[in-house]
């Protein structure tokens, strides 16, 4: 288990660097006169998929957001299942602290966002934007402090971020679903029933789950629910153990996907969605309720919610601090959780999918600026509270 955590942290640290480079490249290409048109044209390339009478025709940007991100969510589903069954969330005592912290870290940012946007029917739809944490960026910053970071603090951040991702998935399913097409939903329910039956029989063929998962993805896409949720559902049904003692299908797939997700899918998502055209940006609009609500949620709501809910959970005796971790380190890492980026941008695209492109631009700017500031402040806070290297646990 410790080996898996270390591998995960190394991957996410490198992925954080890749994300940063992809973001900078996207902004540069979108704003350089020589490449700006080509960048937009590249994302608008039509890609068509046909299977008999079934036809799915989308541009490259939507394929990245709907199809490739489903693989990202498949990995999240596998990680959440592993942690729930045999990892840091497997027992009540282990799970309570990161669970409470994650809930506080979602509720407070949403409330702060609504304080700024409660009276605007359009921007109010973005209430969940600051509720997410980008695990790759957060872990990337944490690893800059090397061996000074206690193992318990790393596990706490990983568990918190995984629960946070699960919360974001539930929010997407419950609040960002368009009008439902019932025949396609019936097909999705049937596909889920097949997955459940395969899991009950402990079918060990990963390819069988992925094949049914492909059908589920198409059904969910057609029924109006966001198609990326298919990835999470498939991840939950792939078994961790098989009756014949073969290697775990879920663990094998998780290891196989981690590198592709970390170094291709998530950076490609950032490259496709972070290319904000800065020409015409009005400074005053950076201080609009939308941008301020996002910034307040990420920079204030995240640390306040995580810190308060963690303190209450420990105070009431429902949880204990991890071994070698002090509460001021929990406070410092809560600032780091204000890095929203990938999931925040993803929710932005859902919240304003039928609205003004200008709203999306200023929401993305708010996310990028607040996430960058959270990374800097979180690093400085951790640097101040972590023990010197010769005293590190």
Curated annotation (Swiss-Prot):
GO biological process, one term: regulation of pH
Gene3D superfamilies reported for this sequence: Na+/H+ antiporter like domain (1.20.1530.10)
Segments crossing the lipid bilayer: 14-34, 60-80, 96-116, 125-145, 155-175, 179-199, 218-238, 263-283, 292-312, 330-350, 362-382
Entry keyword set: Antiport, Cell inner membrane, Cell membrane, Ion transport, Membrane, Sodium, Sodium transport, Transmembrane, Transmembrane helix, Transport
GO terms for MF: sodium:proton antiporter activity
GO cellular component term of the entry, any: plasma membrane
Localization: Cell inner membrane
Topology of the protein relative to the lipid bilayer: Multi-pass membrane protein
InterPro entries: Na/H_antiporter_dom_sf, NhaA
Domain of life (superkingdom): Bacteria
Summary of the function given for this chain in its UniProt record: Na(+)/H(+) antiporter that extrudes sodium in exchange for external protons.
Family classification: Belongs to the NhaA Na(+)/H(+) (TC 2.A.33) antiporter family.
Protein name, as recorded: Na(+)/H(+) antiporter NhaA
Source organism per UniProt: Pectobacterium atrosepticum (strain SCRI 1043 / ATCC BAA-672) (Erwinia carotovora subsp. atroseptica)
